[in-house]
């Protein structure tokens, strides 16, 4: 498969269906969190879906502004998806400040 230019910290539309139980579903924006070297080498990427339903007290969500809209990165819904599920054209990027906050949140949730 030809490598698509999916980069860490970029946001793309992703088709998450079919899903089960409480997984976030439908076609929605998702943030790529996997390393660029893996994104180039594999046919899959690691993503965190975005949602417009805000949960300010949830410690597994990071609120961001994307294209003048408030969204949350749902790190509790992190998953691996085929690149075929993503649109190649990105719809946004995290700011350096948001990237740092996301790294801290991911580390707190999964590395400690």
Regions picked out by a protein language model, each given a short descriptive name:
Residues 1-112:
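Conserved functional hotspots at enzyme active or ligand-binding sites that engage polyanionic ligands
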